[in-house]
Amino acid sequence: MSKVIGIDLGTTNSAVAVLEGKEPKIITNPEGNRTTPSVVAFKDGEIQVGEVAKRQAITNPNTIVSIKRHMGEADYKVKVGDKSYTPQEISAFILQYIKKFSEDYLGEEVKDAVITVPAYFNDAQRQATKDAGKIAGLNVQRIINEPTASALAYGLDKDDDDEKVLVYDLGGGTFDVSVLQLGDGVFQVLSTNGDTHLGGDDFDNRIMDWLIKNFKDENGVDLSKDKMAMQRLKDASEKAKKDLSGVSSTHISLPFISAGESGPLHLEADLTRAKFDELTNDLVEKTKIPFDNALKDAGLTVNDIDKVILNGGSTRIPAVQKAVKEWAGKEPDHSINPDEAVALGAAIQGGVISGDVKDIVLLDVTPLSLGIETMGGVFTKLIDRNTTIPTSKSQIFSTAADNQPAVDVHVLQGERPMAADDKTLGRFELTDIPPAPRGVPQIQVTFDIDKNGIVNVSAKDMGTGKEQKITIKSSSGLSDEEIKRMQKDAEEHAEEDKKRKDEADLRNEVDQLIFTTEKTLKETKGKVSDEDTKKVQEALDDLKKAQKDNNLDEMKEKKDALSKAAQDLAVKLYQQNGGAQGAAGQAGPQGGNPNDGNNGGAQDGEFHKVDPNK
């Protein structure tokens, strides 16, 4: 089996790793960075991903950031020109880019991947992530939870007795807490809890809001109405947040941010760590509820926890580290890089799948309860949250009315007692139930959750044996036809990108050849015959014309012709120079001898120091 890469598809940044030998290794992107911004931009018909997309976000309105926050939303679309893109398609552009530079690094085609998701992602969000992988041309071998992946990275080389580990994962846009038990190569998730709409972006926004308010109070100008100013504020806020992880105060300077009646306006502000902590205190406190719930669901207290692992770039915020230390009663473990741990863990799981890693078993859980709607709009659970997956559970239900010919199976995910308050995953009908009094027919409903957390549901009439099955696609799931269409679009974009790169390479080669040929003609003037230089000059003029006409086919043809003519000229020049040197060699005091090694030919020989006084 070929290499299985591990991808941390993050809200703000993504990372990819692969198992080399027994160790997972981060694959750097073309810029040499170990993480890649999860940013996609559309510019002049070209799709840009990563650093280049993020850099021009200020000037390009067709730039998409934090798309992960919208995974699983059925009606969410990104409109670019006259075309709309789903979150799955935007994510696929990021995955496609990661796939490409991973292939460049490995020197082979990458087909298989393990992709991570926040532990608290529901079925719709997981399915959307898997669909994004398919669109990007990846066979998604496994979807695993981010905290579980970081625990794999932490625990790979640990041979200690059983450890209970709490993973506090605060990323760019999502937050999870998971409790795991590690021992003898078994990584068992005991519980998970979180908030899929809380992360570092929210901390950035607090700084932005503070800057906007202060600027409005001082200058009477509302920067929130200015899109370009907002992008500059966003970048400055993110930088200030990062700075305050290392220093107690930072200066924010944004010259010419706006203009007033008296001329240009500049934003200058000093932000202390104390003020930042004050602005974001409620966000930090908001993470305490999932922290407590994860411990409660695992049946543990903080005293039972052996290690606390911090994961996600936002855990570098000092107030976050301080809070976790206070809540857990112990110093968090800093042995793994919070930006890279998830990708490294995903690569380890990839190694398990490919057979390169032995003696590791990953037992994950479903984050939310699953069940169906029953009479009175009640949500009846079949599988409780934090159940180890894969799993299967069946329960017998019956009809609610006499002679009821069909039952509507409404599949839900959540924790609320009433169906209306929970998340609909899908619904289907079991029809042709024979007439019978209410409560007599026996309908067996079975839930299956696979290793990726994807749900399959079936309903079977025990009397007739008739059965109806569905794989829950959820309201946001894509059909096979839609995925195939999007795969084709992605492939076409890849072909377009290659064509565009080939064109750019050709133009660069033409420019370089014209420059070097003109230089050569100047340098060889008078050294070779006019007839020889005329051929090169004509070929040069032909290429310049093709370049001016922007005719790519002609440019390629004329480039090859000029290359040949220039090469012929270089050969003649070399022969003339060689001949001159040969003649000079024969003009020695002894007249030369064909066997004395001075005949101008290249042959083996010994070199001796010559004494000029002899």
Swiss-Prot record:
GO terms for molecular function: ATP binding; ATP-dependent protein folding chaperone; unfolded protein binding. Residues 577-597 have a biased composition (Low complexity). Residues 481-505, 605-614 have a biased composition (Basic and acidic residues). Residues 466-505, 541-562, 577-614 are annotated as: Disordered. The modification Phosphothreonine is found at residue 174. Induction: By stress conditions e.g. heat shock. InterPro entries: ATPase_NBD (IPR043129), Chaperone_DnaK (IPR012725), Heat_shock_70_CS (IPR018181), HSP70_C_sf (IPR029048), HSP70_peptide-bd_sf (IPR029047), Hsp_70_fam (IPR013126). Pfam families: HSP70. Keywords: ATP-binding, Chaperone, Nucleotide-binding, Phosphoprotein, Stress response. It comes from the Bacteria. Belongs to the heat shock protein 70 family. Acts as a chaperone. This is Chaperone protein DnaK. It comes from Lactobacillus acidophilus (strain ATCC 700396 / NCK56 / N2 / NCFM). The gene is dnaK.
